[in-house]
Regions:
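Conserved catalytic-core segment of NTP-binding enzymes
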Residues: 24, 50-63, 72-95, 99, ...
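Conserved G1/Walker A P-loop phosphate-binding module
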Residues: 1-68, 73
Length: 219
């Protein structure tokens, strides 16, 4: 439901085992205009039969590669804390250790509209790494704050870079205009394209992978 609310998609959302077997990905824009890809993975469960464990983990490749992990907690569940522990155990199993979770995890406490008003969540948050936010995917309450937090996360990690591109690498210029926040764009007397841009760590790595001879130097 939260995935649909954020992306405007109409993906199957049911409280049942393996309602979605494969990750679903959709592009979306954050309040700043930054474009990201949001991936919705198969739900995490405990006591999974041994013969299904590896198949289950193989669907979580997007989690390992993600710049930011959104851990959605069901505030209305009596087992919210236990379910959070199950997710943490799976993250450990697929190689996302506690240090990585400190840097790349946002805890979203969903269903705030139907959670028992007599039950608060500080005890659940105690010991959890990362950032936290409370919202309701159904009513939309808190969703704007969530989007702003995601936006702020990426903005804080961006690097301000200067890239000098020779004429024969016009594709690199086009890629930057699609994947970076362009601050300045000009040409020098030699016909080189000089771009000042803000790049996320992931996009900076992707740029170097495609064009290893072009340096994106921090300014």
């Amino acid at each position: 439901t939260l995935f649909n609310r954020l992306t405007g998609a109409n993906v199957l959302s049911k409280d049942m085992l393996f309602a979605t077997l494969d990750p679903t990905m959709r592009g979306m824009f954050l309040p700043s205009g930054r474009q990201i890809v949001l991936a919705d993975t198969v739900g995490f469960i405990s006591a999974l039969p041994t013969e299904l464990v590896e198949a289950f983990k193989s669907t979580l490749e997007e989690v390992v590669q993600a710049d930011l992990i959104l851990h959605v907690h069901d505030m209305s569940s009596d087992l919210c804390s236990e379910e959070a522990s199950d997710v943490s155990a799976v993250l450990d199993d697929i190689g996302i250790d506690e240090q990585s979770r400190d840097d790349h995890l946002l805890h979203i406490f969903n269903k705030a509209d139907i959670a028992d008003k007599a039950v608060d969540i500080p005890f659940i948050q105690t010991g959890l790494n990362g950032r936290t936010i409370k919202c309701s995917a159904l009513s939309g309450s808190g969703v704007d704050d969530l989007l702003n937090q995601i936006d702020e996360y990426f903005a804080q990690r961006d690097a301000d870079c200067q890239i000098i591109i020779n004429p024969e690498h016009a594709a690199a210029s086009a890629w930057l205009h699609q994947n970076a926040n362009i601050v300045e764009s000009r040409y020098n007397a030699e016909g080189q394209h000089i771009i000042r841009a803000r790049l996320s760590p992931a996009n900076k790595a992707r740029f170097h992978k495609h064009w290893p001879d072009i340096k994106a130097r921090n300014t």
